[in-house]
Every structure is written in structure tokens, then in C-alpha cells.
UniProtKB/Swiss-Prot annotation:
Residue sites binding CTP per the record: 13, 148-150, 188-193, 224
Active site: 395, 521, 523
Name of protein: CTP synthase
GO cellular component, one term: cytosol
Catalytic activity: UTP + L-glutamine + ATP + H2O = CTP + L-glutamate + ADP + phosphate + 2 H(+); L-glutamine + H2O = L-glutamate + NH4(+); UTP + NH4(+) + ATP = CTP + ADP + phosphate + 2 H(+)
Pathway(s) served: Pyrimidine metabolism; CTP biosynthesis via de novo pathway; CTP from UDP: step 2/2
Family, per entry: Belongs to the CTP synthase family.
Keywords noted in UniProt: ATP-binding, Glutamine amidotransferase, Ligase, Magnesium, Metal-binding, Nucleotide-binding, Pyrimidine biosynthesis
Length: 571
């Protein structure tokens, strides 16, 4: 029978519930157990597809085309398991389903209420994940914080769930904050005590406490929380701040999280195999140019590669989370250090690409929507093309590459995307035919996994080493085939198309060290242990460029309008 783990959060939001869920999934999988992870989000949106990246961060797309919370990306990367639309549930989708049932008469005239109709629908969604994949364990993360009004139906549903499946088949983990108060010179457990008290007031007694803190908990503090929160001391787990999220599974393994979970669920204790994950973390942390011994021999870290991501949502780095993680995976595999620069596309418009990109070894233009910053992205493509800097365009990044070529090489007057200029005389990017009559924005794009046929003897084919690939998409606009012959005549290579040849999926330039752009999102399929080949080869090309000093930034102050943020791996 499938076992169920529920992860709640207290004290503050963004405390790391998703990483705890993903880490526990990795620890269980390392013991040979199959795992599926579900996210319950309390917002009323049906899905995050129409939400602003500034508020919500990245929209992660599953193979079956669901637009989901970015935590599903963590789940997939940590467990190396593909999730589906069943693994992402919002309160909006729950209410939508219940209201649709009421309109059909499914409730036979009964009064529809939060209890039992909403809570029953929530429980059914959890059971649906178990029935679909039949995993050994379903881990469910409840979004938000205990005490939020929005979370109450979810908390009531999981309270009932233990009674439904019997006690030994359900486990409650509460992730909470134990802050260090500098003025007092000590850590304070009172916020955790109050958070657990709030949870217990609605009928949920946590079995395990995962305590987020910036230093290790003393045994005395663990005993204190054990006493006040009615949790065995061995089930009080330290989750200390880490340089990289990929270290967290190893930290939680040392603290005994998986052992406690298996014991409480009455499951067999098995020896974990985390050797590959430990090797990955070792590669990540050895930044002192020393040799690392691996199963393949000796790996030397000898360089730092400067990568610039030119985007329009850089104020919130989570807006490009999967792109950043894919770059980290590539850096680990190539064996070099990554220095990452997030550049505001609007700044490129006003100050020029050279100001921000002169010392970049590689440039990425990621996806996005809307006209804001588009000229900065197009200027970035031109700079990368002319200066022979390795370039990777993703979704909108490919469309910008097409527009740049149309204007500067094909000499098409005022060439643009129909999305940004419906009056353009040369719409080199046009609306997909099936999108012509679409009115609703949510869930109506070309979404999910689609096949792509590669042309032989191209950079794309050399990268993938296979004729047909499958990649995840999220777009409404596409290359306009009316211009396909002109682009080929002027030197463009269309190296990937849909199997019927109708849709352009990959473009590249031959006389360039590495210039390739895709209509799809390869970042969604990159894994720590198996980096995506496009990111891997892009990073190798960037590594082969002449190494330069750190990226120059001429800004005198950091504001939301001119921000250039930097982060280095590990992060």
C-alpha cells in the first residue's frame, strides 16, 4: 500500500518546504523506494500559467503540458522522475472542479460546502497521484504557512487523511524557523512552539520537525522543542542553511530524516546509495582548482566561465530558475566554475550591449512574454552573433534571433513578431494557426512534450546524437514559414522541425563557434546527474572562449530599473 507524507510550513513563507520534500524524495529513492511528489497551492488561480514572474517566479512545464509551480522542477531534478499535471493542484482548480460538478448536478441538489465537498476533492487529488503511478510513497507539500486563511481547506483535508488511510500510513512533517537573535546571542524556539500550537489547534500533531536555521541546533534546543512540541527528540531535524540546495539531501540524511520517516511509516529500513549524489556535491564545492578523483579518473577545475542571462524578469532570479540550474548542472559536468550575471534587457536598450556583455564567455536569452525589453534582447543577439560569443536562445530567445537576422542580414524592413507589432510588414514570427481563434490565456498555448526531427550534419544533431528528440514547449507564436526560403538563402540553418516539417523548432548559424536557438525549453529536462546536452555543449563552448575579467557593470546604483545581479555557483 502507498504511504503518504505531508509537509507543512510555519512561521514564515519561503522556508524551504519544497527542497525538504525533494530531498526526502531523493533519500527514499536512494533506498530503492519509488516516490511521487505533489504540490498543493492555496492560491485561487487555476494554475500559475497566467501569473506574473515577478510574483510567482518560473512556470515549470511538465511533459503532459501542465503549467505548474517551480517546486515541481525541484521534485524532478532531485528525484530524476518526471511529474505530471496530477502533481500540481491549486485551490482554484479544486473550486473549479467542485463548481463544475455542482453545475452538472453531481451533488443531487445538496448544499455544496467546504466540508465535505472541497476537502473530499482535495483528498481525491492526493489519491489520484497514488493510483496513477502506484509509488511506494506520495509526498505532499502544502503551500503557504500554517495560520493562513487560504490554507485551511488543505490542512483540514490532510487532517482527515490520516484517519482515512490509518495512522501508520500517513506522516506529518512540519518545517519551521528557528532564528538566531544576535542581540541575545542565542537561538529562539518560541516561533516554532507557536507554529506547532497553531497546527495542533486544527487537529494535526506533527511527527517530525524540520528546523530551518543558520547554524546547527544544540542537543539542548532539540530536547526543548521535543518537550514543548510533543515530538521525539530524534525527530527534531536540523536543516541548516547551505551554499547549495544539492547539499540539503546529504545534510538531512546525516540528521536522520529518512530513517525517522521510514520508522514512523513502518517501512523497511534500507541502506541508502548516495555515492553519486556525494560525487556531485564534491564537484560542486571543489572550487580551489584542486584535482577531484571520480570514478572516471581525475577531474581538474581550472577556469571560471562568465555567463550572462539577458532577461526582463531579473529582479526575481526564480523567474529563470530552471535555466540557472541547467547551467549549474553543465558547470559541474564540464568541471569549471560558473559566474552568473543576470542582465536587464531594458538596460541593454539604453546603454548598449557592450556595456554589460563585453567580458561574457557565453550569452543566453531566455523565454518571456510582452514587448518590454524586446529591443534589448534583439541587440544582445546581434552582439553575440557579430562578436562570435557562444549563444543559446530559448523560446522567445529564438524568436529574437529570427528578428535580428531578418532585420540585419535578410534586410526585411521593420521585421518583427506579430505579438509585439501586429502592423509589421514582415511578421517573421507569427501566431500558430491553431491559436488564431483562442480567447482565453490560461492553458491554451502549445504546451508539453513534442517530437522534433533533427537535420543531419548540424550542430543540433552533433549535440543530441539522435534523429528525433522530445522537448517541452510553452509558446503561442512560431517562425513564419513564408520566410523560410529567404532565411536559408541568406545563410540560416533550420536544423530542427516538427516531424511533419511544418514548425521550425531549432535554428543555428554555421560560421560561429556556437550559435543555436530553440523554440522549446530544454532547461526543463536538465538533471544534476545528466545535464541537458544543449546546456552542456553551450557551456563547453563558453569555456573554450578566452577567459576575461569579471563582467563590467557601469551602474552607480542598483534599482529595479537598472539592476544587474550576480550569483556564483555554488548557490
Amino acid at each position: 500500500m502507498t504511504k503518504f507524507v505531508f509537509i507543512t510550513g510555519g512561521v514564515v513563507s519561503s522556508i524551504g518546504k519544497g527542497i525538504v520534500a525533494a530531498s526526502l524524495g531523493r533519500l527514499l529513492k536512494s533506498r530503492g523506494y519509488s516516490v511521487s511528489i505533489l504540490k498543493l497551492d492555496p492560491y485561487i488561480n487555476v494554475d500559475p500559467g497566467t501569473m506574473s514572474p515577478f510574483q510567482h517566479g518560473e512556470v515549470f512545464v511538465t511533459e503532459d503540458g501542465a503549467e505548474t509551480d517551480l517546486d515541481l522542477g525541484h521534485y524532478e531534478r532531485f528525484t530524476d522522475t518526471s511529474m505530471s499535471r496530477l502533481n500540481s493542484v491549486t485551490q482554484g482548480s479544486i473550486y473549479q472542479a467542485v463548481i463544475n460538478k455542482e453545475r452538472r448536478g453531481d451533488y443531487q441538489g445538496g448544499t455544496v460546502q467546504v466540508i465535505p465537498h472541497i476537502t473530499n476533492e482535495i483528498k481525491e487529488r492526493i489519491h489520484r497521484v497514488a493510483k496513477n503511478a502506484n509509488p511506494d510513497v506520495v509526498i505532499t507539500e502544502i503551500g503557504g504557512t500554517v495560520g493562513d486563511i487560504e490554507s485551511q481547506p488543505f490542512l483540514e483535508a490532510i487532517r482527515q487523511f490520516r484517519k482515512d488511510v490509518r495512522r501508520n500510513n500517513a506522516l506529518y512533517i512540519h518545517v519551521t524557523l528557528v532564528p538566531w537573535i544576535a542581540s541575545a546571542g542565542e537561538m529562539k524556539t518560541k516561533p516554532t512552539q507557536h507554529s506547532v500550537k497553531e497546527l495542533r489547534s486544527i487537529g494535526i500533531q506533527p511527527d517530525i520537525l524540520v528546523c530551518r536555521c543558520d547554524r546547527k541546533l544544540s542537543e539542548g534546543l532539540k530536547e526543548k522543542m521535543s518537550e514543548f512540541c510533543d515530538v521525539p527528540v530524534e525527530s527534531v531535524i536540523t536543516s541548516q542553511d547551505a551554499q547549495s540546495i544539492y547539499e540539503v539531501p546529504l545534510m538531512l540524511e546525516t540528521e536522520g530524516l529518512a530513517v525517522q520517516a521510514l520508522e514512523l511509516l513502518k517501512m523497511e529500513q534500507r541502506q541508502p546509495n548516495l555515492s553519486h549524489w556525494k560525487t556531485l556535491v564534491n564537484r560542486l564545492y571543489h572550487r580551489d582548482k584542486q584535482d577531484i578523483r571520480t570514478s572516471q579518473g581525475k577531474l581538474s577545475i581550472t577556469a571560471t566561465v562568465e555567463i550572462a542571462i539577458v532577461g526582463k524578469y531579473i529582479q526575481l532570479s526564480d523567474a529563470y530558475l530552471s535555466v540557472v540550474e541547467a547551467l549549474r548542472h553543465a558547470a559541474i559536468a564540464v568541471g569549471v566554475d560558473l559566474n552568473l550575471h543576470l542582465v536587464n534587457a531594458e538596460d541593454v536598450e539604453t546603454k548598449g550591449a557592450r556595456t554589460y556583455l563585453e567580458k561574457a564567455n557565453g550569452i543566453i536569452v531566455p523565454g518571456g512574454f510582452g514587448v518590454r525589453g524586446i529591443d534589448g534582447k534583439i541587440a544582445t543577439v546581434e552582439y553575440a552573433r557579430i562578436n562570435k560569443i557562444p549563444f543559446l536562445g530559448l523560446c522567445l530567445g529564438m524568436q529574437c534571433a529570427v528578428i535580428e537576422w531578418a532585420r540585419n542580414i535578410a534586410k526585411l524592413d521593420a521585421a518583427h513578431s506579430f505579438e509585439f507589432d501586429p502592423q509589421t510588414p514582415n511578421p517573421v514570427i507569427n501566431l500558430l494557426p491553431e491559436q488564431q481563434d483562442v480567447v482565453d490565456l490560461g492553458g491554451t498555448m502549445r504546451l508539453g512534450l513534442y517530437p522534433c526531427r533533427l537535420q543531419g550534419d548540424t550542430l543540433a544533431f552533433k549535440t543530441y546524437q539522435q534523429e528525433v528528440i522530445y522537448e517541452r514547449h510553452r509558446h503561442r507564436y512560431e517562425f513564419n514559414n513564408a520566410y523560410r526560403n529567404l532565411f536559408k538563402e541568406t545563410g540560416y540553418i533550420i536544423s530542427g522541425t516538427s516531424p511533419d516539417g511544418r514548425l521550425v523548432e531549432i535554428i543555428e548559424l554555421p560560421a560561429h563557434p556556437f550559435f543555436i536557438a530553440t523554440q522549446f525549453h530544454p532547461e526543463f529536462q536538465s538533471r544534476p546527474s545528466t545535464p541537458h546536452p544543449l546546456f552542456h555543449n553551450f557551456f563547453q563552448a563558453a569555456n573554450s572562449q578566452e577567459k576575461c575579467d569579471n563582467l563590467s557593470v557601469n551602474n552607480t546604483e542598483e534599482t529595479p530599473d537598472n539592476l544587474v545581479s550576480k550569483s556564483s555557483i555554488p548557490n
